[in-house]
Amino acid sequence: MSVRLQTTTLWYHPSQQHDPERVFGNPRYEGRTPSYVIWNLLERYTREGDLVVDPFCGGGTSIDVAAHLGREGRGFDIAPSRDDIQQADARSLPLEDDSADFVFMDPPYSTHIEYSDHPDCIGKLDAFEAEYLDAMDGAFAEAQRVLKDRRYLAVYVSDTFKKKRGFIGLGAELYVLLKRRFRPVDHVAVVRGNRKLEKPRFHKTAAEDNFFLRGFNHLLIFKQERGERAR
């Protein structure tokens, strides 16, 4: 597979890994971020030696890609899965103001995955409740604090649907929160390479019960512009 920069706002990653000769992130970590997405972001918005920060580091894909590209990756998680990921709440990072050159976030999309038993885990908050959005706004405020002026932030998130509760457009909800703090750059749809989407029984259930399977993730790209009102 020849890896290349995406040039439209519709991305498709044919594999979890952008480099078939390497493994980026813990392959056993549920809900891990495709390295292809992070590679595209870092190639566009960072330079060699830049500090890349991931407050929801999970399986460590972001810091592995950062290291491969010659960037300094610092990963944080409420429940670290690796020794090179530091324990911290995304709402309170042990970083100085204006220290990060790029911030990447792949936060929990509600309670679909059991991430940890930590009482402060945002993954325990139901996205249908106000507490989830309050927590995410706290994480965005912290990103605003640590991100340098004129540098970029990207948030990778999926909408959510639950039977008997309905649909919540997390991409739209988080966009509104981010726009209060940063300047919008672009909004990319990333086609989900999910094996469940290849199974006929899931499509049969979706058709019979009249709902849609999540076919893409939102990639929300913003820029820090201190002293200028986001617009």
Where are these regions (language model features)?
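Class I S-adenosyl-L-methionine-dependent methyltransferase catalytic core
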Residues: 1-231
